[in-house]
Design a protein with these regions (language model features):
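N-terminal anchoring/stem segment of glycosyltransferases
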Residues: 1-91, 98-102, 188-189
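Charged, glycine/proline-rich intrinsically disordered loops and linkers
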Residues: 16-39, 141-170
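Glycine-rich nucleotide phosphate-binding loop and flanking beta-alpha elements
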Residues: 12, 115, 192
Length: 204
């Protein structure tokens, strides 16, 4: 069985960073995205090396992806309303499909993920049973406790209730999970079943 781990680092220009926390940050605080950009640059090599070493320790291929130029151009032309941050997030799902053409099982790790185990992910998690992701449901607050000052558009609360509203609009059950896609383990079979990009334009 062919397996691969990959990660993604796109150094989004500062001018294109969306300041999603502008309404909640203190006047003298640094925007989260500015701080993240700076920390990634400082810790770049360490964050790459830890993933390379982990992949080597469990005997699977590793790929570090750092160029999304063509994908970025495609989105800017066809979906100009989408932020660079969100283009990157769609790009990582696109890459799951690209690697799925060659590999039976794929593990994606966000750039800030640091493997701290010697266990083989692919042996611990049986990807024949489904997609391996973490849900953040425990971080969703009751709607009556949510105010504009307690969340951002990236918070689990926003993701949960926005998804709920869209499900209700389509006449579906509002029950949903808040999925953290910082770590995604998936098989080629389930990528095909997911059909993520099949109705992409309508879903947007």
């Amino acid at each position: 069985m062919k397996r691969i781990i990959f990660s993604l680092f796109i150094d989004i220009p500062k001018a294109e960073l969306d300041l999603f926390d502008d309404h909640i940050k203190k006047p003298d605080a640094v925007h989260t995205n500015y701080n993240t950009k700076n920390e990634f640059q400082i810790n770049y090599q360490r964050l790459v090396d830890c993933k390379v070493e982990y992949a080597k320790s469990i005997g699977v291929d590793f790929k570090m992806v750092e160029d999304y130029t063509e994908y970025y151009k495609f989105f800017r032309k066809n979906y100009p309303e989408i932020t660079s941050y969100n283009i990157v997030n769609f790009f990582k799902i696109h890459l799951l499909y690209e690697f799925g053409k060659k590999y039976d099982e794929v593990l994606y790790l966000d750039f800030d993920v640091v493997p701290n185990t010697n266990e083989n992910f692919f042996e611990v998690w049986d990807l024949s049973k489904g997609i391996c992701v973490l849900n953040n449901n425990e971080r969703v607050s009751p709607i009556q406790k949510i105010t504009e000052r307690t969340q951002t558009i990236r918070s689990p609360n926003a993701k949960y209730y926005n998804a709920q509203a869209m499900l209700i609009e389509k006449g579906l059950s509002p029950t949903n999970d808040v999925i953290n896609t910082g770590i995604v383990g998936i098989s080629k079979k389930h990528l095909d079943q997911l059909e993520y990009f099949t109705d992409f334009k309508d879903d947007l």
